[in-house]
Amino acid sequence: MEPSPLSPSGAALPLPLSLAPPPLPLPAAAVVHVSFPEVTSALLESLNQQRLQGQLCDVSIRVQGREFRAHRAVLAASSPYFHDQVLLKGMTSISLPSVMDPGAFETVLASAYTGRLSMAAADIVNFLTVGSVLQMWHIVDKCTELLREGRASATTTTITPAAATSATVPGAGVPSGSGATVVPATVGSVRSHASSRASENQSPSSSNYFSPRESTDFSSSSQEAFPASAVGSGERRGGGPVFPAPVVGSGGATSGKLLLEADELCHDGGDERGPVVPGAGLRRPTYAPPSIMPQKHWVYVKRGGNSPAPAPLVPQDPDLEEDEEEDLVLTCEDDEDEELGGGSRVPEAGGREATLSISDVRTLTEPPDKGEEQVNFCESSNDFGSYDGGGPGAGLDDSGGPTPSSYAPSHPPRPLLPLDMQGNQILVFPSSSSSSSSSSSSQAPGQPPGNQAEHGAVTLGGTSSGALGMPGGPGGTPGGTGSGDGNKIFLCHCGKAFSHKSMRDRHVNMHLNLRPFDCPVCNKKFKMKHHLTEHMKTHTGLKPYECGVCAKKFMWRDSFMRHRGHCERRHRLVGGGGGGGPGPGGPTGPTLPLKRESPGAGGGSGDEASGATPQSSRRVWSPPSVHKVEMGFGGGGGTN
């Protein structure tokens, strides 16, 4: 080993770099993770700058004559609607329905790049429409929350200091002597928001634009106290939707602008307090919905059972407390499957549970008023108990169906009748009660041998036995007729009701002016599939309708029906004028194998004329008088 070099002073010099020992190698299993959280926002900001400058934009969107340029990747990642348009259909130019506001769409398009959305309070409905069409559910949920909040702010009341603690949520921290303006503490106004949808590609018609809780009376709910742990849990109770807590802002109310974060999908479950309006005069402007929005059309669910009057609510187990407003729910999305699948359980105030099913659902045109009896379109008559030989409602559970284990009369005298999948009422009665009940449609399987139940589908009528088609009523027959308005539980925002969800969705597409059915030949778009089927006949030249009298073919059914009526009438007139023709009971025109002939074919030999049958006499298209002259010439030729 060479000695280390010495300096002139005799000190050892450092070794050269090439002679230094190599660094120790890192372990093979060690992995270094580096995170750059600012890259995501910087990337979106850069893409937004490119969009504003028109760089690298590969798709154009047209809204009411205005054109917007954007990036396909960003649109497909932010909207399921654009995902289907640019990926599945490969479109580079997209035309949106004219119902959308161009200004609102421009703001929503910018929010896809920035994650921020700024809107005026008066334009929330326009943003709600844009979010519904584009299936951007976080915007729909936020706009729905703001609309509910704006409507609830109009019903706020100034309460006295003595009642301040009873109207607010316990633990809210409001001083008893402050005299502040407090929003009435209801379950619908203090629950946190929990958005639940069946899928990302859900139809916009299934969106809950409004909650029925704002139109209810707050006078009774202000006297009941709810613990803070009973709200804000974000869970569904009783199958009803959980509504967000309206938070009345203090800073944005004065400027008239609402600044929203697009990625704020739900509230944190931290401090759950009753919303208190900061200040005396700061309130959101009252929202007046247009005609296409729902006007207090909600579905009312009535609790079944003959339970005694509930005791006054006291703080107890949060899961057992229920407000009287839980009776108002919306039938949409996955709640329909829960109701059709046997009903859901709603805990009542006293700790008991009541079964809710589709038979308990009825449609209201106005919110329920306290002290006013609601008309139940699904109730039976008072003499319904005569079918089972027991008390009223015997053999029916809370949902209106037969129960094998209990046939005791324990229900009110006007029980609810169940509905089948098509929305028809089902009458339930024992087969051994009367002779008329033996003519029912079928027996329900799984019933006790001595008390088998039969049922038949009837239409909804009045509350009398004759209107329900019961034999006991005057002129009542099984399957009586009546109006079926009670079966239409699927509501549109314009006020129309439908008995099936698919019919309601198709009707909503008409509102949105959507034309999803394209012609592959001429690219013409149609709203209905059968319209496209009829349109395809113009390209194929198919004429499927043929007249049985003159063998003429038609492409359209209405033209064929109009021609056939005229053709048959002319044949009857021609056939009735000839002597020896068939009477009114003879064969009609469509059943005769006739062909069109010229008028000159009527003359011929005597054998032809004398032996002419009624069928051959109808071949000439002429009035009856001319027809007689032709037959006379033919007869003369035959005798000569």
Swiss-Prot record:
Compositionally biased tracts (Gly residues): 469-482, 574-588
Polar residues biased stretches: 192-210
Biased composition annotated in UniProt, kind: Low complexity: 431-442
GO BP annotations listed: regulation of transcription by RNA polymerase II
Region (Disordered): 191-244, 308-327, 332-482, 571-640
GO cellular component, one term: nucleus
Biased composition (Acidic residues): 318-327
Domain BTB: 57-121
UniProt modified residues of type Phosphoserine: S203
PROSITE patterns in UniProt: BTB, ZINC_FINGER_C2H2_1, ZINC_FINGER_C2H2_2
Main location: nucleus
Name of the protein in its database record: Zinc finger and BTB domain-containing protein 22
Organism: Canis lupus familiaris (Dog)
